[in-house]
A protein has these predicted regions:
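Short beta-strand His + acidic residue motifs that chelate non-heme Fe in jelly-roll/DSBH
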Residues: 114, 122-127, 135
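Non-catalytic, conserved peripheral segments adjacent to functional cores
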Residues: 1-109, 128-130, 137-202
């Protein structure tokens, strides 16, 4: 294999991969290949990505958990500035790990990437003052196909780092803060998603 190190089936969940590109540094700075199709195929990952996206979010923002139902997306995600805790939840009905989650800290410093196959819900929490988040997807956004699930469903039990608060029966951000007092910040839509038992299955 060339310029990447791949950890497969992280958290015991089939298909989830953590990818670490080789970083070549010297006194001037560094260089790395953030994506190389040949290296990915040599690692057994053969995915055709069609779009790159980038977002900026401030500390305490939680985006998710999202998916597309009829046009599911595989995502390759990374943080190019700041730090996020990135989460994938298995929604594949026939999977032995249905309803299980795994989380990875992604940062500009560790340069890790998280590969999330089709059939998962995905989201992230921003832990730094700001974070820029980049992701490749293998299908386009379809506005009428959006799905989601509650980020704090106790049946799933995601352990969001630095987050304090008490579950009150919904995905509302009310009462949740980070350890430094920063209020949790979710979109109105993301505060209305339901739990696993009422969520779409692939």
């Amino acid at each position: 294999m060339g310029q990447i190190k791949v950890e497969k089936n992280v958290g015991g969940i089939e298909g989830l991969c953590v990818i670490e590109p080789a970083v070549h540094g010297d006194a001037r700075g560094y260089f790395m290949e953030t994506y190389n199709e040949k290296d990915m195929k040599e690692a057994g990952i053969d995915i055709h990505f069609v779009q790159d996206n980038q977002s900026m979010s401030t500390k305490g923002v939680l985006r998710g958990l999202h998916f597309q139902k009829q046009y599911p997306q595989c995502k390759l995600v990374r943080a190019v500035r700041g730090t996020v805790f990135d989460v994938a939840v298995d929604l594949r009905a026939n999977s032995e790990t249905y309803g299980k989650w795994n989380g990875v800290t992604l940062s500009a410093e560790n340069k890790k990437q998280f590969l999330i196959p089709e059939g998962f819900a995905h989201g992230f929490l921003v832990l730094s003052d700001e974070a820029e988040f980049c992701y490749k997807v293998n299908d386009f956004w379809h506005s009428n196909d959006e799905g989601g699930m509650a980020w704090n469903d106790p049946e799933i039990g995601i352990e969001w780092p630095e987050l304090k608060g008490e579950y009150k029966g919904s995905a509302s951000a009310e009462g949740y803060t980070l350890e430094d007092g920063t209020a949790l910040n979710l979109s109105d839509k993301d505060q209305k998603w339901l739990g696993l038992k009422d969520t779409f299955k692939f």
